[in-house]
Amino acid sequence: MIPVRCFTCGKVIAGSWEEYKRRTGEGEDPATVLDDLKFVRYCCRRMFLAHVELVDTMAPYQ
């Protein structure tokens, strides 16, 4: 679960997560994808690049 907004600037980022994940999964360069999605601030880019999906890993322990 990616946060809805960037922690630093507050820009809404969650709506672009699925497209980012799909395009990078197809082998496209993450920097190019973020440029196309209009994420130019490094704080927002960090949210995408540093995010790790742990929901599926932690779900069995609930």
From Swiss-Prot:
InterPro entries: RNA_pol_su_RPB10, RNA_pol_suN_Zn-BS, RPABC5/Rpb10. Keywords: Cytoplasm, DNA-directed RNA polymerase, Metal-binding, Nucleotidyltransferase, Transcription, Transferase, Zinc. Pfam families: RNA_pol_N. One of its GO terms (cellular component) is cytoplasm. Gene3D superfamilies: Homeodomain-like (1.10.10.60). It is found in: Cytoplasm. It comes from the Archaea. The keyword Transferase applies. The keyword Transcription applies. Its EC number is 2.7.7.6. Zn(2+) binds at residues 6, 9, 43-44. GO terms for biological process: DNA-templated transcription. It catalyses: RNA(n) + a ribonucleoside 5'-triphosphate = RNA(n+1) + diphosphate. Its cofactor is Zn(2+). Part of the RNA polymerase complex. DNA-dependent RNA polymerase (RNAP) catalyzes the transcription of DNA into RNA using the four ribonucleoside triphosphates as substrates. This is DNA-directed RNA polymerase subunit Rpo10. It comes from Methanococcoides burtonii (strain DSM 6242 / NBRC 107633 / OCM 468 / ACE-M).
